[in-house]
């Protein structure tokens, strides 16, 4: 999948406490067992999370299980926030920005219900993305951003 390397890069930073690293093989094992197993796995993981951070790549908003996790967190009144990851290098390349996945929350179709999205992307002098500076910007700010999620109000 398009952003797997970027997501693993962030998880390996070790800056978010209590976040287990699920490698691609483990995810494939869960995914191979079907939709109900995936939903149950997400539900179980979410029970123990203080907040949900959505790592937003180019295709994140179109992924059904990401949408499920966002809606589940919203309904459970878990703090939610997004961090854009398109500016991180994956296989030596950066990507284009993806759409806001929070616009698909039930009752808010087409608009973000006030959830923060942080973008660590740093552009060089010529306007191209500097992936190393973007990585460092993310390292410098991830902890503070992770505590700024917003919850559903009534």
Question: What is each residue range found by the language model?
Answer:
Residues 36, 63, 100-103:
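Flexible, active-site-adjacent loop/turn segments at secondary-structure boundaries
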């Amino acid at each position: 999948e398009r952003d797997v390397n970027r997501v693993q890069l962030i998880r390996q930073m070790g800056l978010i406490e209590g976040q287990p690293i699920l490698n691609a093989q483990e995810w494939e094992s869960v995914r191979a067992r079907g939709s109900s197993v995936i939903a149950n796995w997400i539900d179980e993981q979410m029970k123990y999370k203080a907040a949900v951070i959505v790592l937003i790549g180019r295709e994140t908003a179109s992924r059904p299980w990401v949408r499920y996790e966002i809606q589940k967190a919203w309904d459970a009144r878990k703090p939610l926030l997004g961090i854009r990851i398109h500016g991180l290098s994956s296989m030596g390349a950066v990507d284009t920005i993806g759409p806001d996945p929070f616009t698909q929350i039930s009752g808010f179709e087409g608009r973000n219900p006030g959830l923060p999205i942080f973008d660590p992307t740093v552009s060089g002098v010529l306007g191209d993305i500097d992936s190393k500076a973007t990585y460092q910007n993310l390292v410098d700010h991830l902890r503070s951003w992770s505590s700024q999620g917003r919850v559903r109000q009534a």
